Amino acid sequence: EELIVASSALTAEQQLEIFRRYGIRNDVHLRLSSGLFDIITTGLYVKSLGYVPLISVSKVRLTRAEAFAKACLDYFGAALGLLALAPLFVAIAVAIKRDSPGPVIYRRRVLGVGGKPFDAFKFRTMYVDGDQMLTPQQAAELQTHHKLKDDPRITRVGRVLRKYSLDELPQLVNVLLGQMSLIGPRMITLPEKARYGKWDLNLLTVKPGLSGLWQVSGRSDIGYEERVHMDMHYIRNYTIWLDLQLILRTILAVV
Protein backbone atom coordinates (compact mmCIF):
# COMPACT_ATOMS: atom_id res chain seq x y z
CA GLU A 1 0.00 0.00 0.00
CA GLU A 2 1.05 3.61 -0.59
CA LEU A 3 0.50 6.31 2.04
CA ILE A 4 0.85 9.93 0.87
CA VAL A 5 0.82 12.67 3.51
CA ALA A 6 0.55 16.11 1.91
CA SER A 7 -0.97 18.27 4.61
CA SER A 8 0.72 21.59 5.33
CA ALA A 9 -1.07 21.77 8.67
CA LEU A 10 0.98 18.97 10.22
CA THR A 11 3.84 19.93 12.49
CA ALA A 12 7.28 18.35 12.17
CA GLU A 13 6.60 16.35 15.34
CA GLN A 14 3.36 14.97 13.89
CA GLN A 15 5.06 13.99 10.63
CA LEU A 16 7.88 12.39 12.57
CA GLU A 17 5.34 10.31 14.47
CA ILE A 18 3.84 9.20 11.14
CA PHE A 19 7.32 8.20 10.02
CA ARG A 20 7.86 6.21 13.21
CA ARG A 21 4.62 4.27 12.62
CA TYR A 22 4.79 3.65 8.89
CA GLY A 23 8.22 4.64 7.58
CA ILE A 24 9.95 1.30 8.10
CA ARG A 25 6.98 -1.04 7.54
CA ASN A 26 7.49 -3.34 4.58
CA ASP A 27 3.79 -3.31 3.63
CA VAL A 28 3.56 0.51 3.38
CA HIS A 29 5.28 2.89 0.95
CA LEU A 30 5.30 6.24 2.75
CA ARG A 31 5.63 9.65 1.07
CA LEU A 32 5.73 12.93 2.98
CA SER A 33 5.38 16.44 1.57
CA SER A 34 7.55 18.11 4.19
CA GLY A 35 11.23 18.32 4.92
CA LEU A 36 12.42 15.91 7.55
CA PHE A 37 15.99 16.00 6.33
CA ASP A 38 17.06 17.80 9.50
CA ILE A 39 15.79 14.84 11.51
CA ILE A 40 16.03 11.77 9.28
CA THR A 41 19.26 11.67 7.32
CA THR A 42 19.23 8.17 5.86
CA GLY A 43 16.90 6.23 3.62
CA LEU A 44 15.14 9.24 2.05
CA TYR A 45 14.84 10.40 -1.56
CA VAL A 46 12.71 13.03 -3.33
CA LYS A 47 10.23 12.28 -6.12
CA SER A 48 7.65 14.68 -7.57
CA LEU A 49 3.95 13.86 -7.85
CA GLY A 50 1.86 16.46 -9.67
CA TYR A 51 4.64 19.05 -9.26
CA VAL A 52 4.62 18.45 -5.51
CA PRO A 53 7.98 17.21 -4.16
CA LEU A 54 7.39 14.21 -1.92
CA ILE A 55 9.91 12.61 0.38
CA SER A 56 9.88 8.84 -0.08
CA VAL A 57 11.32 6.38 2.40
CA SER A 58 13.71 3.76 1.09
CA LYS A 59 13.64 0.51 3.04
CA VAL A 60 17.22 -0.36 2.00
CA ARG A 61 19.91 2.25 2.63
CA LEU A 62 22.81 0.35 1.03
CA THR A 63 22.89 -0.94 -2.51
CA ARG A 64 22.82 -4.70 -2.89
CA ALA A 65 26.51 -4.73 -3.76
CA GLU A 66 27.40 -2.62 -0.72
CA ALA A 67 25.26 -4.73 1.60
CA PHE A 68 26.80 -7.94 0.24
CA ALA A 69 30.33 -6.58 0.59
CA LYS A 70 29.71 -5.45 4.17
CA ALA A 71 28.10 -8.79 5.09
CA CYS A 72 31.08 -10.70 3.66
CA LEU A 73 33.53 -8.45 5.47
CA ASP A 74 31.66 -8.94 8.74
CA TYR A 75 31.29 -12.71 8.47
CA PHE A 76 34.77 -13.64 7.26
CA GLY A 77 36.45 -11.00 9.41
CA ALA A 78 34.70 -12.24 12.55
CA ALA A 79 35.38 -15.91 11.74
CA LEU A 80 39.08 -15.29 11.11
CA GLY A 81 39.31 -13.14 14.22
CA LEU A 82 37.80 -15.83 16.44
CA LEU A 83 40.14 -18.49 15.06
CA ALA A 84 43.25 -16.33 15.36
CA LEU A 85 42.41 -15.08 18.84
CA ALA A 86 41.26 -18.39 20.36
CA PRO A 87 44.42 -18.80 22.52
CA LEU A 88 44.03 -15.22 23.77
CA PHE A 89 40.39 -15.91 24.67
CA VAL A 90 41.48 -18.86 26.84
CA ALA A 91 44.19 -16.81 28.57
CA ILE A 92 41.78 -13.97 29.32
CA ALA A 93 39.16 -16.37 30.67
CA VAL A 94 41.69 -17.92 33.07
CA ALA A 95 42.87 -14.47 34.23
CA ILE A 96 39.30 -13.31 34.91
CA LYS A 97 38.44 -16.40 36.96
CA ARG A 98 41.60 -16.07 39.05
CA ASP A 99 41.16 -12.34 39.62
CA SER A 100 37.62 -12.27 41.02
CA PRO A 101 34.61 -14.57 41.46
CA GLY A 102 31.91 -14.50 38.84
CA PRO A 103 31.26 -15.45 35.20
CA VAL A 104 33.80 -14.89 32.44
CA ILE A 105 31.27 -13.44 30.00
CA TYR A 106 29.00 -10.49 30.73
CA ARG A 107 25.82 -10.03 28.69
CA ARG A 108 24.69 -6.48 28.06
CA ARG A 109 21.15 -5.92 26.75
CA VAL A 110 21.39 -3.45 23.85
CA LEU A 111 19.36 -2.34 20.82
CA GLY A 112 19.97 -3.59 17.30
CA VAL A 113 18.47 -2.73 13.92
CA GLY A 114 14.95 -1.39 14.27
CA GLY A 115 15.33 -1.23 18.04
CA LYS A 116 15.29 -5.03 18.40
CA PRO A 117 17.06 -5.94 21.66
CA PHE A 118 19.83 -8.54 21.88
CA ASP A 119 22.59 -9.57 24.30
CA ALA A 120 26.03 -8.19 23.44
CA PHE A 121 28.85 -10.35 24.82
CA LYS A 122 31.83 -8.90 26.70
CA PHE A 123 34.52 -10.24 28.97
CA ARG A 124 33.53 -9.37 32.52
CA THR A 125 35.61 -6.43 33.75
CA MET A 126 33.72 -5.53 36.94
CA TYR A 127 33.13 -7.09 40.31
CA VAL A 128 29.82 -8.90 40.71
CA ASP A 129 27.36 -6.49 42.39
CA GLY A 130 29.90 -3.72 41.82
CA ASP A 131 27.20 -1.04 41.82
CA GLN A 132 27.14 -1.31 45.60
CA MET A 133 30.67 0.15 45.65
CA LEU A 134 29.54 3.47 44.15
CA THR A 135 29.12 6.60 46.22
CA PRO A 136 26.00 8.72 45.57
CA GLN A 137 28.17 11.21 43.66
CA GLN A 138 29.63 8.47 41.45
CA ALA A 139 26.17 7.02 40.82
CA ALA A 140 24.94 10.45 39.71
CA GLU A 141 27.96 10.93 37.43
CA LEU A 142 27.38 7.51 35.88
CA GLN A 143 23.72 8.33 35.27
CA THR A 144 24.67 11.55 33.46
CA HIS A 145 27.75 10.57 31.47
CA HIS A 146 27.40 6.75 31.29
CA LYS A 147 31.03 6.39 32.41
CA LEU A 148 33.30 7.11 35.38
CA LYS A 149 36.91 8.28 35.29
CA ASP A 150 37.95 6.21 38.33
CA ASP A 151 35.42 3.43 38.46
CA PRO A 152 35.82 1.35 41.65
CA ARG A 153 33.74 -1.46 40.16
CA ILE A 154 36.47 -2.43 37.66
CA THR A 155 38.74 -5.34 38.56
CA ARG A 156 42.53 -5.39 38.09
CA VAL A 157 42.27 -7.62 35.03
CA GLY A 158 39.32 -5.56 33.85
CA ARG A 159 41.42 -2.39 33.74
CA VAL A 160 43.92 -4.08 31.44
CA LEU A 161 41.19 -5.47 29.22
CA ARG A 162 39.51 -2.07 28.92
CA LYS A 163 42.77 -0.24 28.27
CA TYR A 164 43.36 -2.32 25.15
CA SER A 165 39.65 -2.85 24.31
CA LEU A 166 40.08 -6.60 24.75
CA ASP A 167 36.87 -6.86 26.76
CA GLU A 168 34.84 -6.39 23.58
CA LEU A 169 36.41 -9.26 21.63
CA PRO A 170 33.54 -11.70 22.42
CA GLN A 171 31.32 -9.45 20.32
CA LEU A 172 32.89 -11.17 17.31
CA VAL A 173 30.30 -13.85 18.12
CA ASN A 174 27.55 -11.22 17.85
CA VAL A 175 28.93 -10.29 14.44
CA LEU A 176 28.77 -13.93 13.30
CA LEU A 177 25.18 -14.10 14.55
CA GLY A 178 24.29 -11.12 12.36
CA GLN A 179 23.45 -8.87 15.31
CA MET A 180 26.43 -6.54 14.92
CA SER A 181 28.95 -5.37 12.33
CA LEU A 182 32.70 -5.10 12.66
CA ILE A 183 32.30 -1.35 12.07
CA GLY A 184 29.27 0.74 12.94
CA PRO A 185 27.82 3.21 15.43
CA ARG A 186 28.25 2.49 19.12
CA MET A 187 25.67 0.21 20.67
CA ILE A 188 23.16 1.73 23.06
CA THR A 189 20.76 0.48 25.69
CA LEU A 190 17.07 1.33 25.89
CA PRO A 191 17.63 4.03 28.56
CA GLU A 192 20.32 5.65 26.37
CA LYS A 193 17.99 5.76 23.38
CA ALA A 194 16.14 8.76 24.79
CA ARG A 195 19.39 10.75 24.87
CA TYR A 196 19.72 10.47 21.09
CA GLY A 197 16.45 12.38 20.72
CA LYS A 198 15.65 12.99 17.06
CA TRP A 199 18.72 11.00 15.95
CA ASP A 200 17.52 7.64 17.24
CA LEU A 201 15.73 6.90 13.94
CA ASN A 202 19.06 7.14 12.10
CA LEU A 203 21.03 5.15 14.64
CA LEU A 204 18.73 2.14 14.55
CA THR A 205 18.74 1.84 10.75
CA VAL A 206 22.12 0.06 10.87
CA LYS A 207 23.76 -2.60 13.03
CA PRO A 208 25.87 -1.40 15.95
CA GLY A 209 29.58 -1.91 15.50
CA LEU A 210 32.33 -3.71 17.39
CA SER A 211 34.40 -0.64 16.56
CA GLY A 212 33.69 2.66 14.87
CA LEU A 213 34.64 6.24 14.23
CA TRP A 214 34.45 7.33 17.86
CA GLN A 215 36.40 4.33 19.16
CA VAL A 216 39.42 5.07 16.92
CA SER A 217 39.30 8.85 17.30
CA GLY A 218 41.89 8.70 20.06
CA ARG A 219 39.74 10.82 22.32
CA SER A 220 38.19 9.15 25.36
CA ASP A 221 37.09 12.40 26.96
CA ILE A 222 34.68 13.66 24.30
CA GLY A 223 31.15 14.51 25.31
CA TYR A 224 28.10 12.36 24.66
CA GLU A 225 26.72 14.79 22.07
CA GLU A 226 29.92 14.64 20.01
CA ARG A 227 29.88 10.85 20.11
CA VAL A 228 26.36 10.98 18.69
CA HIS A 229 27.52 13.28 15.88
CA MET A 230 30.36 10.89 15.03
CA ASP A 231 27.87 8.03 14.76
CA MET A 232 25.66 10.12 12.47
CA HIS A 233 28.67 11.04 10.32
CA TYR A 234 29.46 7.35 9.82
CA ILE A 235 25.88 6.48 8.92
CA ARG A 236 25.66 9.29 6.36
CA ASN A 237 29.06 8.62 4.76
CA TYR A 238 29.34 4.82 4.82
CA THR A 239 31.48 3.10 2.20
CA ILE A 240 33.20 -0.29 2.29
CA TRP A 241 36.50 1.58 2.06
CA LEU A 242 35.66 3.55 5.19
CA ASP A 243 35.01 0.25 7.00
CA LEU A 244 38.38 -1.12 5.87
CA GLN A 245 40.16 2.04 7.03
CA LEU A 246 38.48 1.91 10.44
CA ILE A 247 39.28 -1.81 10.84
CA LEU A 248 42.96 -1.06 10.14
CA ARG A 249 42.95 1.87 12.55
CA THR A 250 41.30 -0.31 15.20
CA ILE A 251 43.97 -3.00 14.85
CA LEU A 252 46.77 -0.43 15.02
CA ALA A 253 45.21 1.23 18.07
CA VAL A 254 45.00 -2.09 19.93
CA VAL A 255 48.47 -3.28 18.89
Regions flagged by a language model, labelled:
Residues 16, 63-70, 151-158, 190, ...:
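Alpha-helical membrane and juxtamembrane elements of multi-pass inner-membrane transport
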Residues 34, 53, 87, 103, ...:
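Proline-centered helix-kink/hinge sites
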